[in-house]
Amino acid sequence: MWFKNLLTYRLTQDVPFEPEALEAALASKPARPCASQELTTYGFVAPFGKGADAPLVHVSGEFLLIAARKEERILPSSVVNDAVKEKVEEIETEQMRKVYKKERDQIKDEIIQAFLPRAFIRRSMIFAAIAPRLGLILVNSASAKRAEDLLSTLREVMGSLPVRPVTVKIAPAATMTDWVKSQHAAEGFYVLDECELRDTGEDGGIVRCKRQDLTGEEIQLHLSTGKVVTQLALAWQDKLSFVLDDKTVIKRLKFEELLQEQAEQDGGDEAQQQFDASFTLMMMTFTEFLPALFEALGGEEIPQGV
């Protein structure tokens, strides 16, 4: 269990997160298949294992892992629109009258209901790690929408979930731009060979650089004309590498082989033990990495009144 992307959320109040109580809460909204006339369903599943006995909360020391699954029927808008157009033309030709918006919308609803049972089904899972002592919820996604779907569903079953995205005191773009300009990142962090530069103007250009020396003259020239760094590939110590963007989203997270080998040694031969060992080691790494990252970005911003 190694996260590949990371969105970080701060608990603004103490939440006990007792495993037994959380298990019962998640069980009140299990994932289930779409009924014939449903577009989508959303619910919780076991992070590891299958079957009715698989726990919905994976506990490893002080850390908890949960997972949700979304199931949705895929109806391409082009297919629906073509069917609506065909039906409207048929009515207008046969009845020699104009079909207006209200009737067109009704036709569209009827066509969707007729197509739904035959639509393809897509399933997707999302994981979230809870670290109560740190006051953090970490979502394995680069999509704020997907993360909010999970958190809002968790809030629904728990009754309350006081949480907000982690923000930092200095704009990440300003910090990353300074690191590339000065050719020196914060302690423990190292600039790699990939970045995205954007002009700050309303219709400004975008420059994406991969496998390129970011200390070179070309990059420095872009920065001297006012472009800022909005994505930057970084490494932290000898433990992980990632791409950071200007909204503090961590993408393409990759743990170094030494960590993965350690997890394999700790986990032994059993799949569940391997899963538990990798999750535990990942979370222990995050307990060092995230405070260091927030500090490197100027420190975490705590809104007044929180």
Curated annotation (Swiss-Prot):
GO terms for biological process: DNA recombination; regulation of DNA recombination. It is found in: Cytoplasm, Nucleoid. Pfam families: RdgC. GO terms for cellular component: bacterial nucleoid; cytoplasm. Its main location: cytoplasm. The keyword Membrane does not apply. GO terms for molecular function: double-stranded DNA binding. It comes from the Bacteria. Keywords: Cytoplasm, DNA recombination. Belongs to the RdgC family. May be involved in recombination. This is Recombination-associated protein RdgC. It comes from Pseudomonas entomophila (strain L48). The gene is rdgC.
